[in-house]
Amino acid sequence: MDLHEDDVLELNVGGCFYSTNRSTLTRYPDSMLGAMFSGRLPSKVDQCNRYIIDGDGPTFRHVLNFLRRSKLILPDGFKEWDILSIEADFYQIEDLIRLIEKAREQIRRDEERERTRAY
């Protein structure tokens, strides 16, 4: 199988469908996705030839946005930190794991500051 960086790949992540370039998925070569889409890990496809990933489908959009932009981009009021953290661990994306930890720590500090201010 020829692997090209500009290949557009179709994904089935927990029943949610995504399209992206191979280069996006291999941006972090030591990650699970990097290994999977560089041919180092076996992969399965569904009946529509979409790569099957047994992850949280809705949360994968945040992982994919990180892979595309190298930034943690989340909607205002985002509350699903535990799920996102679990998914980042599952995909073994160390930079994303660190950004999530940093963001969660900032939220904790902000909440503590608000509690202190309220007294």
What are the functions of these language-model segments?
Residues D2-N12, F17, S23-L99, A103-E105:
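Canonical BTB/POZ domain core
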Residues T20, C48, E111-R115:
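Intrinsically disordered, low-complexity sequence elements enriched in Ser/Thr/Gly/Pro
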Residues E101-Y119:
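Intrinsically disordered, low-complexity regulatory segments in eukaryotic proteins
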